Amino acid sequence: MAEKREDIPTNVVKGDTVIWSKAYPARVVEIVGRTGTTGEVTQVIVEILEGKDAGRLIRRNVKGPVRVGDILMLRETEIEARPLEYSK
């Protein structure tokens, strides 16, 4: 059997309530473009508002409707999406 790792945070269930792992708010500053095979993913630039990376601008891929000024809750702030490549 696989051992349960203690260093990975898990969700806590108390009755009908689920407490998720820490998330950091980030504001959408710019919409870069659409990606995915059918354009279902939007690449955006966000400014992280809290945490150790507060004030940092990073590129993220977002699925679903999004517009400038929206607040996204990011579970991690270290990984950045690759820039879109446009064909000429």
From Swiss-Prot:
Pfam family, one: Ribosomal_S28e
Listed GO MF terms: structural constituent of ribosome
InterPro entries with a match to the protein in the record: NA-bd_OB-fold (IPR012340), Ribosomal_eS28 (IPR000289)
GO biological process, one term: maturation of SSU-rRNA
Taxonomy, superkingdom: Archaea
UniProt keywords, alphabetically: Ribonucleoprotein, Ribosomal protein
GO cellular component, one term: cytosolic small ribosomal subunit
Family from the record: Belongs to the eukaryotic ribosomal protein eS28 family.
Protein name: Small ribosomal subunit protein eS28
Organism whose genome encodes this protein: Nanoarchaeum equitans (strain Kin4-M)
